[in-house]
From Swiss-Prot:
The active site is at residues 121, 126, 149. SUPFAM superfamilies: S-adenosylmethionine decarboxylase (SSF56276). It comes from Clostridium perfringens (strain 13 / Type A). Heterooctamer of four alpha and four beta chains arranged as a tetramer of alpha/beta heterodimers. Binds 1 pyruvoyl group covalently per subunit. This is S-adenosylmethionine decarboxylase proenzyme. Its cofactor is pyruvate. One of its GO terms (biological process) is spermidine biosynthetic process. Is synthesized initially as an inactive proenzyme. Formation of the active enzyme involves a self-maturation process in which the active site pyruvoyl group is generated from an internal serine residue via an autocatalytic post-translational modification. Two non-identical subunits are generated from the proenzyme in this reaction, and the pyruvate is formed at the N-terminus of the alpha chain, which is derived from the carboxyl end of the proenzyme.
């Protein structure tokens, strides 16, 4: 196990940066152009910037941080982005930069433009709907980054993030960068035990997925990818009833969905 057997008394502020990169893929079967367009519109409404903002604010609360500023934007024809600047400790109002809105979205609505902040502690989310006219399989990707410094850890929000989306395929990257020092001046490159990202995911959630790790312990790099085990066809058809299809059609669609998930899971074109 990589990490610390006992707690270390640090000197000054904890300078370690912990970054969690979380990507989920939602797969759907849509045969006609109308079905594809309707699915993209549905996804765009389902995961607009307002809902994504709420998810990131919930994550902020779960990891024990505080919101300093929120920037959000819905895009045309589709897609959305949200950026949340956070701090480990609550700051007195007098110390908060006047440009920060403290998460008060009514203030955002009064501004013609919103400029995102860059800081060591922040959350970002972007959505990427994807389809091709020659393919009946549509995918939707959500890309979330949580970067923290200090004692707070983004790993504590993993279960909530997985449950917040229709997660068919998931890729998770976690890394720790920088160093901090103990009271004797000795450098510390990681401040918690970790052998796998899977240790931070609920066992009941893991039962639903095939999962594998690719970790580089010496570099404090951890990677886990997950693929849903059971394909329930009704969850993948948009505005269609699977029982209106012939058994052969159902098998073919299930097979195509499975192949799409396997390729995304492996990160390589196979079929």
């Amino acid at each position: 196990m990589l990490g610390l057997k006992e707690k270390i008394c640090l000197y000054g502020f904890n300078n370690l940066t912990k970054t969690l990169s979380f990507n989920i893929y939602d797969i759907c079967y849509a045969k006609t152009e109308r079905e594809k367009e309707d699915y993209i519109k549905y996804i765009d409404e389902q995961y607009n910037s307002e809902r994504l903002t709420k998810i990131l604010c919930d994550v902020t609360e779960m990891i024990g941080a505080h919101v300093l500023n929120i920037s959000k934007q819905d895009y045309e024809p589709q897609g959305a982005s949200v950026n949340v600047l956070i701090t480990e400790e609550a700051l007195p109002v007098a110390l908060i930069d006047p440009s920060c809105n403290k998460g008060e979205l009514s203030y955002l609505e009064l501004r013609d433009s919103v400029v995102g902040h860059l800081d060591k502690s922040h959350l970002t989310v972007h959505t990427y709907p994807e389809f091709h006219p020659n393919n009946d399989i549509i995918s939707f990707r959500v890309d979330i980054d949580v970067s923290t410094c200090g004692k707070i850890s983004p790993l504590n929000a993993l279960d909530y993030l997985i449950g917040s989306f229709d997660s068919d395929v998931i890729t998770i990257d976690y890394r720790v960068r920088g160093f901090t020092r103990d009271v004797d001046g000795r450098k510390c490159y990681i401040d918690h035990d970790i052998k796998s990202i899977q240790d931070y995911i609920d066992g009941e959630t893991l039962k639903k997925y095939d999962a594998m790790d690719v970790n580089v312990y010496q570099s404090n790099i951890f990677h886990t990818k997950m693929m849903l085990k059971d394909i329930v066809l009704n969850n993948y058809l948009f505005n269609s009833d699977p029982y209106e299809l012939s058994p052969n059609d159902r098998r073919e669609i299930r097979d195509r969905i499975s192949k799409e998930m396997i390729e995304i899971y492996g990160g390589v074109n196979i079929y």
